[in-house]
């Protein structure tokens, strides 16, 4: 680091030289440099500003870098509210012009140029070079032997473009005429940033020699090179016109196609290519009739796999290469990156330093941006493409990743900003650095300063909350679209690098983005949190409360424009809000340590961290399989036509981005979109989601015996079921055959497995005939995981965390293998393998059921196998019966046995079954024993485990969509069922009889406490003094309202109401709160107006909703024409509104005293209870609701407005009313007496 200081510490930014507000003020002591005189403030363009149309591109930087190192004019956009001396009518909108001067920054009473490098800078700097000038101290010449690599880049260099005198001949040979260069980016133990350029890596692909010679009449490898060069020169465009045969090298090798056992070794041309672009073109276009192999493997993967031991994340050592050649240090003026030291070498100059496992002092940047719309509607959501919508503040926290220490807190502010003293004192009390407030006159200057910090400080890791989908896209769109700033030099590369965000499709209707920045690993904590934990809301405040037990001082979006316009002190409140967001995200980062698990996966899979984050599970398994296949003499084909489904054509190049992820449950739509019957449905059969097409039958479950079980239920789990099936039965591409004649020379059962899958006979040879590649991978991974886990107890706390992340990474990759084979459009699909795994899994469930029922049908049989069972006997008849089987779990209901005894002997029972039925390494384990179990349906149950802990699977007692009142009541009912023995006994008796019987008789006496909860709930719902906050429901806005097929959704109603009231409308992925109100005349009128607004919004082009000003008033609505059935005079009876039309914003309902719809809420409560407790009544929801209603007092409950009018008139309620169940009991006793 060449400038460790963060500049003068600014106490909240109170400075003599102030941004923006001072810029627009009359000339002060600083003279003309402070801005135009007051009389010129109205047009703002003189003396410095010119019309936008005359804007010229800033003077280009020097040829060796493309980042801004100098700038003397720029587009100036700033909000007029910063002109604090102007009258109110002049402070709306923005100034937009062109300014001729260097960009400025103000801090702590000082002013300086943003791009100037010198001592006492306002932010820390680690870059050695800036603008082609070496700023290293005299004598700086660090010795580099060992360095840690965290990112790997690749690019193509041309010999004619290089200065031969600067390069060793071996490097020139590697790029003559062109060649791929791999760049390793990392850090030394001393903290020096290193870039090592590795020459000589070549990509290659394979083609069958016999096919090539037959199609192209080749007699030697050189002939093939000539044919390929000719094909490239004849391709459209001028890209390949200079290609010659010297660009290629071909050799003949013996390899075997990985598909099918009967495939035998053959001769292949291995064609080396010097450019990935050429490779892609050849594989896609050169002789399509000839199959290509491994053409999609990038240069970085080749570098890692072709050099045994090399890793994408770990320690390397420089060493002498062949013929004692050494790595060549690069001269600073020839650096291509912003590193401290650069070397040129070949792969033989590198070795892995296996003895080091800790991380060097990498830097982490955590940032957050605040934006504000600048048009007529300041409450509109900002759009990056609108020049008037501005970034107003950026908080930036800089951590040392190895020590977790927060080293710098920076706040970039458009306009002057004074942080509150209370915030500064709070940070000081926590031992955190005092924030450095950097103030700017214009948005461009602030954004340029931020990007200059990114370049000069160069954090290796960056995090934030939803930065991939919002913060980075917004910033980059501003810089490129509005200010025309080239970004290719702002990563670690000084030019020709990558710094971009792009969309990678939709997941659960959410637009997903991907960011790639050379030398900067972006880890979005929003994605990490949504993957790791399940919450009802993923807003940062909700996550902080749930995970950190902390909460932030929230600032309403509606308040930001007023705070921003109010002056430096109120802008400081926004700054505090911005900083605390980054602080919370930093805490989340160091709680989950996502970089450790991601780097462990990257290291295991042989891919860099960025691919680990964005490219899904497929690429991880593919790369590992590629490595092993090469060792065993196999090659992997590129073609995807081998296992096409009935209806689809596989793409030539399947995207590897998350295509193997299972579709998540439609959160927010499972109830919300079905409410009015217009929700979208997924078709039956094979489904295709987010690039994943599954064309085979999934794992079978044994249908559950629904009901409430108060006898012990033992749950046996298969340990790593699918990986163990693959290992036990030697399943693989290479062991599969579809032809009986291919295995005719082998002995059935002994040498191969024969199995029928989907009506077709498949054959898999045993391991002694040919060992499965997938099995080898799994065996090695699991052995590695076992060894790592064994080291954890003896490790230091820091090392234990790292080891735990490593073993978790191995588990993730192991569990990806089955899915890897089952994705039809994946990188290497084999649906036969995937379908065989699930078929064997189904057979194992059935075999286990038959074995348990036959082997332990009588207690004496159980006693013979387990003598200790004599002490397990409980009162009542004995039986052992499987009541549910779910993919890898088996539920065994054990009557006449104690839960304690079953818990003690469970592992022995599981081992007994494993030995009797399954091949190793398949094994059953006793996971738990339920003392009580409410088995509702497949994958839905609630139970109490021996010891008292409750386990809930597939049943959301606390649903995101339900209100707090319903969630609390549902939980209270469940607790009663499981922890009140009287209620449990009554419920068990209830479940043993057919549900229809209870329609004609009273419910068991023991359910009275259960009914009391429902009675109390009914009372609270109908209480006029109830707290409305308890009845707030929420639903996620999963996409823009116009994109919904079903428009009759409650949360969409509230969205349009907010828009009509010019309130802040929610963003996509926000959860919209609402309450259901009673139908009144005012509500009916509002619904009519909303219908018009929906029509306007549906017709509006673009991404933004129609302006609220377009909403017609009720008086302008067309008069409805009376129908013949209407009463005379045309006055028709008001229709009953849909529930979704009765949705209202809770804040509005509270402020205006809008009455709630009590009937809806109680029906909703009964519906929620029925979903959980219908298992007591044979899963008959209609009977369940009918019986639960017996507990409700039979009284008339008028609407709230009617009840209020009755009370005002002096009427009062008479009697509490009896419940239907009480009435039924009285009548039952009366008839018994009369009888």
Curated annotation (Swiss-Prot):
InterPro entries attached to this UniProt entry: DNA-dir_DNA_pol_B (IPR006172), DNA-dir_DNA_pol_B_CS (IPR017964), DNA-dir_DNA_pol_B_exonuc (IPR006133), DNA-dir_DNA_pol_B_multi_dom (IPR006134), DNA/RNA_pol_sf (IPR043502), DNA_pol_B_thumb (IPR042087), DNA_pol_palm_dom_sf (IPR023211), DNA_pol_type-B (IPR050240)
Keywords assigned: DNA replication, DNA-binding, DNA-directed DNA polymerase, Endonuclease, Host nucleus, Hydrolase, Multifunctional enzyme, Nuclease, Nucleotidyltransferase, Transferase, Viral DNA replication
Compositional bias segments (type: Basic and acidic residues): 650-661, 676-691
PROSITE patterns named among the record's database cross-references: DNA_POLYMERASE_B (PS00116)
SUPFAM superfamilies registered for this protein in UniProt: DNA/RNA polymerases, Ribonuclease H-like
Entry EC no(s): 2.7.7.7, 3.1.26.4
One record GO biological process: bidirectional double-stranded viral DNA replication
Compartmental location: Host nucleus
GO molecular function: 5'-3' exonuclease activity; DNA binding; DNA polymerase activity; DNA-directed DNA polymerase activity; nucleotide binding; RNA-DNA hybrid ribonuclease activity
GO cellular component, one term: DNA polymerase complex
Result of changing residue 646 to T: In strain: Nonneuroinvasive mutant HF10
Function: Replicates viral genomic DNA. The replication complex is composed of six viral proteins: the DNA polymerase, processivity factor, primase, primase-associated factor, helicase, and ssDNA-binding protein. Additionally, the polymerase contains an intrinsic ribonuclease H (RNase H) activity that specifically degrades RNA/DNA heteroduplexes or duplex DNA substrates in the 5' to 3' direction. Therefore, it can catalyze the excision of the RNA primers that initiate the synthesis of Okazaki fragments at a replication fork during viral DNA replication.
Subunit structure comment from the entry: Forms a complex with the ssDNA-binding protein UL29, the DNA polymerase processivity factor, and the alkaline exonuclease. Interacts with the putative helicase-primase complex subunit UL8; this interaction may coordinate leading and lagging strand DNA synthesis at the replication fork.
Xref: PANTHER family: DNA POLYMERASE CATALYTIC SUBUNIT (PTHR10322), DNA POLYMERASE DELTA CATALYTIC SUBUNIT (PTHR10322:SF23)
Similarity comment text for this entry: Belongs to the DNA polymerase type-B family.
Designated name of the protein: DNA polymerase catalytic subunit
Native source organism of the sequence: Human herpesvirus 1 (strain 17)
Organism ancestry: Viruses, Duplodnaviria, Heunggongvirae, Peploviricota, Herviviricetes
């Amino acid at each position: 680091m060449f400038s460790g200081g963060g500049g003068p510490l600014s106490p909240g930014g109170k400075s003599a030289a102030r941004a923006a507000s001072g810029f627009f003020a009359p000339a002060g002591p600083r003279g003309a440099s402070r801005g135009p005189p007051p009389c010129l403030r109205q047009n703002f363009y003189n003396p410095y500003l010119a019309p936008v149309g005359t804007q010229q591109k800033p003077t280009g930087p020097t040829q060796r870098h493309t980042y801004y190192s100098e700038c003397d004019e720029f587009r100036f956009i700033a909000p007029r509210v910063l002109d604090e001396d102007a009258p109110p009518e002049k402070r709306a909108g923005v100034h937009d012009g062109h300014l001729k001067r260097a960009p400025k920054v103000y801090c702590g009473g000082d002013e300086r140029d943003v791009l100037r490098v010198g001592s006492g800078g306002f932010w820390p700097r680690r870059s050695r070079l800036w603008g082609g000038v070496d700023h290293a101290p005299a004598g700086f010449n660090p010795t580099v032997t060992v360095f840690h690599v965290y990112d790997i880049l690749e690019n193509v260099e041309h010999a004619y473009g290089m200065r031969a005198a600067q390069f060793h001949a071996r490097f020139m040979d590697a790029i003559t005429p062109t060649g791929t260069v791999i760049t390793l980016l990392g850090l030394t133990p001393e903290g020096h940033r290193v870039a090592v350029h590795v020459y000589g890596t070549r990509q290659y692909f394979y083609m069958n020699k016999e096919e090539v010679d037959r199609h192209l009449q080749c007699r030697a490898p050189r002939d093939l090179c000539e044919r390929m060069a000719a094909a490239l020169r004849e391709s459209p465009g001028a890209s390949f016109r200079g290609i010659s045969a010297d660009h290629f090298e071909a050799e003949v090798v013996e390899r075997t196609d990985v598909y099918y056992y009967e495939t035998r070794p053959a001769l292949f041309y291995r064609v080396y290519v010097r450019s990935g672009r050429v490779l892609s073109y050849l594989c896609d276009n050169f002789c399509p009739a000839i199959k290509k192999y491994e053409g999609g493997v990038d240069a970085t993967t080749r570098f890692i796999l072709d050099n045994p031991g090399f890793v994408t994340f770990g320690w390397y050592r420089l060493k002498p290469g062949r013929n004692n050649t050494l790595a060549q240090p690069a001269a600073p003026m020839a650096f291509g990156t912003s590193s401290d030291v650069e070397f040129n070498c070949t792969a033989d100059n590198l070795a892995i330093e296996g003895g080091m496992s800790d991380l060097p002092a990498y830097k982490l940047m955590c940032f957050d941006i605040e934006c504000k719309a600048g048009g007529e509607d300041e409450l509109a959501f900002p759009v990056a493409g609108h020049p008037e919508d501005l970034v107003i503040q950026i908080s930036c926290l800089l951590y040392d990743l190895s020590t977790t220490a927060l080293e710098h807190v920076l706040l970039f502010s458009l306009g002057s900003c004074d942080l509150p003293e209370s915030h500064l004192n709070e940070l000081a009390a926590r031992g955190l650095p005092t924030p450095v407030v950097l103030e700017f006159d214009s948005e461009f200057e602030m954004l340029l300063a931020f990007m200059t910090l990114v370049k000069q400080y160069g954090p290796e890791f960056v995090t934030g909350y939803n930065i991939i989908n919002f913060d980075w896209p917004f910033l980059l769109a501003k810089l490129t679209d509005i200010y025309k700033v080239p970004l290719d030099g702002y990563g670690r590369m000084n030019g020709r690098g990558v710094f971009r965000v792009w969309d990678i499709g939709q997941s659960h209707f959410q637009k997903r983005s991907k960011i790639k920045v050379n030398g900067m690993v972006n880890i979005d904590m929003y994605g990490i949190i949504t993957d790791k934990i399940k919450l009802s809301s993923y807003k940062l405040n909700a996550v902080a409360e749930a995970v950190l037990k902390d909460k932030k001082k929230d600032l309403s979006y509606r308040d930001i424009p007023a705070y921003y316009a109010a002056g430096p002190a109120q802008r400081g409140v926004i700054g505090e809000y911005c900083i605390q967001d980054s602080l919370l995200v930093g805490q989340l980062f160091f709680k989950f340590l996502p970089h450790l698990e991601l780097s462990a996966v990257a290291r295991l899979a042989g891919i860099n961290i960025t691919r680990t984050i964005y490219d899904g599970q497929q690429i991880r398994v593919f790369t590992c399989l590629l490595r092993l296949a090469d060792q065993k003499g196999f090659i992997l084909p590129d073609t995807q036509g081998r296992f096409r489904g009935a209806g689809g054509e596989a793409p030539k190049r399947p995207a590897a981005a998350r295509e193997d992820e299972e579709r998540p449950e439609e959160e927010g739509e499972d109830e919300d979109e079905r409410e009015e019957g217009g929700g979208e449905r997924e078709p039956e059969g094979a489904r295709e989601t987010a690039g994943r097409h599954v064309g085979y039958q999934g794992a079978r479950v044994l249908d559950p015996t629904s009901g409430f079980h108060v006898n012990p239920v033992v749950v046996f789990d298969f340990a790593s079921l699918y990986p163990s099936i693959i290992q036990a039965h030697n399943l693989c591409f290479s062991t599969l055959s579809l032809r009986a004649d291919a295995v005719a020379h082998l002995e059935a059962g002994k040498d191969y497995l024969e199995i029928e899958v989907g009506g077709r006979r498949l054959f898999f040879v045993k391991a002694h005939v040919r060992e499965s590649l997938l099995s080898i991978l799994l065996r090695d991974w699991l052995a590695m995981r076992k060894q790592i886990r064994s080291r954890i107890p003896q490790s230091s706390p820091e090392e234990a965390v790292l080891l735990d992340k490593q073993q978790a990474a191995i588990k993730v990759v192991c569990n990806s293998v089955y899915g890897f084979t089952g994705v039809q459009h994946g990188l290497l699909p084999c649906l036969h393998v995937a379908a065989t795994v699930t078929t064997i899994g189904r057979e194992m469930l059935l075999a286990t059921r038959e074995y348990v029922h036959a082997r332990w049908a009588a207690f004496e049989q159980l006693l013979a196998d387990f003598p200790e069972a004599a002490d397990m006997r409980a009162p009542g008849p004995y039986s052992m019966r499987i009541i549910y089987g779910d993919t890898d779990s088996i539920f065994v209901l054990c009557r006449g046995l104690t839960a304690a005894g079953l818990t003690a002997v469970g592992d022995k029972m599981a081992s007994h079954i494993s030995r009797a039925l399954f091949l190793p390494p398949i094994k059953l384990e006793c996971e738990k024993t339920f003392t009580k179990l409410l088995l509702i349906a497949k994958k839905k149950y609630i139970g109490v485990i021996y010891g008292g802990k409750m386990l809930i699977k597939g049943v959301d007692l606390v649903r995101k969509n339900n209100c707090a009142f319903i969630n609390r009541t549902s939980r209270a009912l469940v607790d009663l069922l499981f922890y009140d023995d009287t209620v449990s006994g009554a419920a068990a008796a209830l479940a043993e009889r057919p549900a229809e019987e209870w329609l004609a008789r009273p419910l068991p006496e023991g359910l009275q406490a259960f009914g009391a909860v429902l009675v109390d709930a009914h009372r609270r719902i109908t209480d006029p003094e109830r707290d409305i906050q308890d009845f707030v429901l929420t639903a996620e806005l999963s996409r823009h309202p116009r994109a919904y097929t079903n428009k009759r959704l409650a949360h969409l109603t509230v969205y349009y109401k907010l828009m009509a009231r010019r309130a802040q409308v929610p963003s996509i992925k926000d959860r919209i709160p609402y309450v259901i109100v009673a139908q009144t005349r005012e509500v009916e009128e509002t619904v009519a107006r909303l219908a018009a607004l929906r029509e306007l919004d549906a017709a509006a082009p673009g991404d933004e909703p129609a302006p609220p000003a377009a909403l017609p008033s009720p008086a302008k609505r067309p008069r409805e024409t009376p129908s013949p059935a209407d009463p005379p005079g045309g006055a028709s009876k008001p229709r009953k509104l849909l529930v979704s039309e009765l949705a209202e914003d809770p804040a509005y309902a509270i402020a205006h005293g809008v009455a709630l719809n009590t009937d809806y809420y109680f029906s909703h409560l009964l519906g929620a209870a029925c979903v959980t407790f219908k298992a007591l009544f044979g899963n008959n929801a209609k009977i369940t609701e009918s019986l639960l209603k017996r507990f409700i007092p039979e009284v008339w409950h008028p609407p709230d407005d009617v009840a209020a009018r009755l009370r005002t008139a002096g009427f009062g309620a008479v009697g509490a009313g009896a419940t239907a169940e009480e009435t039924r009991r009285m009548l039952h006793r009366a008839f018994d007496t009369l009888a």
